[in-house]
């Protein structure tokens, strides 16, 4: 079957009409949610300008948090974090209440762990791991093999292929071994493909050859046989040349007996070009047919370049988050939904683009945005649908 499609589908034909439709859709969803039977909580919208929608408790009990709903659904809802953020009590109160999963934004990347060959500093990564253990949060490890954020001692060396293999094996064995039994899933190889779905001629491809991917998974599995091992890729959530390349790559790995358990769909998205939910669902399904899991690993949705008012864009952003949450919840193999940051205040995007943005579930003032309530409603509906 040919899975390559054009992601620029009819949803973008008239942007202004689209945002009006999004606004109407979210209002309808919230009204329908409030009318559903067998619920012990209800959603009550307040004006979008404040970016808050309150949850009113019933007389018998307080409403569940997003984390409590996720625990009930046996679904990982996580976020990227950093030890520096964990010193803020406002941050940790929100983190503990709303998320059951954690991933290091940068602390487990090679350049942060080992600035000299053979010498590792795990102190910051350990802070994150210890915090997760105390608060009963599952941890995803990110990332073992990437061509960015490598230490200078490695990138500036001129070594033989065998020497590079020794270094890569030592790194994977050291890092995975340190946290064996404590990390549920590793992004073993990060972003190996180009936009056309071919292997990029990156640092590791040039140092070792295309087999660096297979070797990395084998070494990671040897270091922790219980950890789930993922290939993590960007812009490959829908049906396009890149996702076709991912499918071909992981299919070949499975045929060779390589221990791979899933595909990470990063999903750093732009509001003006969201993925088509049906395409994402089809992509997840074909991976399920291979026996592979899917994790949404780095989700954020940029607003800055989309047309329309801020209020309209916040509502439209919520629809994108909701579409993806519902798609993941409906897929038999999609087990995790991670955003790349907790609040807009800590997002990486403004630092990269130089523009203010609001890509996450919580606003800079710590209040939940329409995107949060959209994910909440999707999770709540999945739980209600499963009730007899």
Task: Describe every region a protein language model picked out.
Residues 97, 101-115, 124-236, 303:
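Substrate-binding cleft and catalytic face of glycoside hydrolase catalytic domains
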